């Protein structure tokens, strides 16, 4: 059995954004400023809430992050969709880490709950993604539940995050 790397630093995550980590044409994270992950602290193909694998990651919030001045002037808040996108980014990363071929795309999610906000004084975001299943066919499909913590408090939850990997290039 091959032992896979179980954590990734920022430089390794950037290499995924450049298409180097999993090879050309395979799962790729966005590059800054759209990259919503700074570290993957733990990743496993077993365990998690459904015993089908999990990923844990972190993002360091800075008061000068690009979205604060424009969302909203006088009341800076990170857009909730960026936290949700971070969950999709990690779901796709997991599929690439498993060695599955193809380019990633967010497909859907079930219920999303926003219970708090990310403000400039927030220090650390922590992601938790727990896999329910990975289906392998013409399209590789990962389904997971996820959460986002801000300074230790769960503020976002999403069920049935779905990301697919396709060998077709984006149009």
UniProtKB/Swiss-Prot annotation:
Domain of life: Bacteria
Swiss-Prot/TrEMBL catalytic activity: a (3R)-hydroxyacyl-[ACP] = a (2E)-enoyl-[ACP] + H2O; (3R)-hydroxydecanoyl-[ACP] = (2E)-decenoyl-[ACP] + H2O; (2E)-decenoyl-[ACP] = (3Z)-decenoyl-[ACP]
Associated pathway: Lipid metabolism; fatty acid biosynthesis
Active site residues of this protein: 71
Subcellular location: Cytoplasm
Main location, first listed in the record: cytoplasm
UniProt GO BP: unsaturated fatty acid biosynthetic process
Entry keywords, A to Z: Cytoplasm, Fatty acid biosynthesis, Fatty acid metabolism, Isomerase, Lipid biosynthesis, Lipid metabolism, Lyase
GO (cellular component) term, any one: cytoplasm
Keyword Plastid attached: no
EC number: 4.2.1.59, 5.3.3.14
GO molecular function: (3R)-hydroxyacyl-[acyl-carrier-protein] dehydratase activity; trans-2-decenoyl-acyl-carrier-protein isomerase activity
Pfam families: FabA
UniProt keyword Isomerase, yes or no: yes
Similarity field: Belongs to the thioester dehydratase family. FabA subfamily.
Function as written in the Swiss-Prot or TrEMBL entry: Necessary for the introduction of cis unsaturation into fatty acids. Catalyzes the dehydration of (3R)-3-hydroxydecanoyl-ACP to E-(2)-decenoyl-ACP and then its isomerization to Z-(3)-decenoyl-ACP. Can catalyze the dehydratase reaction for beta-hydroxyacyl-ACPs with saturated chain lengths up to 16:0, being most active on intermediate chain length.
NCBIfam families documented for this protein: fabA, PRK05174.1
Subunit record text: Homodimer.
Full protein name: 3-hydroxydecanoyl-[acyl-carrier-protein] dehydratase
Species whose genome carries this gene: Rhizobium rhizogenes (strain K84 / ATCC BAA-868)
Recorded name of the encoding gene: fabA
């Amino acid at each position: 059995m091959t032992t896979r790397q179980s954590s990734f630093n920022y430089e390794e995550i950037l290499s995924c954004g450049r298409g180097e980590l999993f090879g050309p044409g395979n799962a790729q994270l966005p590059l800054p400023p759209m990259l919503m992950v700074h570290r993957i602290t733990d990743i496993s193909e077993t365990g998690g809430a459904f015993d089908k694998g999990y990923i844990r990651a972190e993002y360091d919030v800075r008061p000068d992050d690009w979205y604060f001045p424009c969302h909203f002037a006088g009341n800076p808040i990170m857009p909730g969709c960026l936290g949700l996108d971070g969950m999709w980014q990690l779901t796709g990363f997991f599929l690439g880490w498993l060695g599955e071929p193809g380019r990633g795309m967010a497909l859907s999610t079930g219920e999303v709950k926003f219970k708090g906000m990310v403000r400039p004084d927030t220090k650390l975001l922590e992601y938790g993604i727990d896999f329910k299943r990975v289906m392998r066919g013409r399209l590789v499909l990962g389904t997971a539940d996820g959460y986002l913590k801000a300074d230790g408090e769960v503020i976002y939850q999403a069920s049935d995050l779905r990301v697919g990997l396709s060998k077709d290039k984006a149009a």
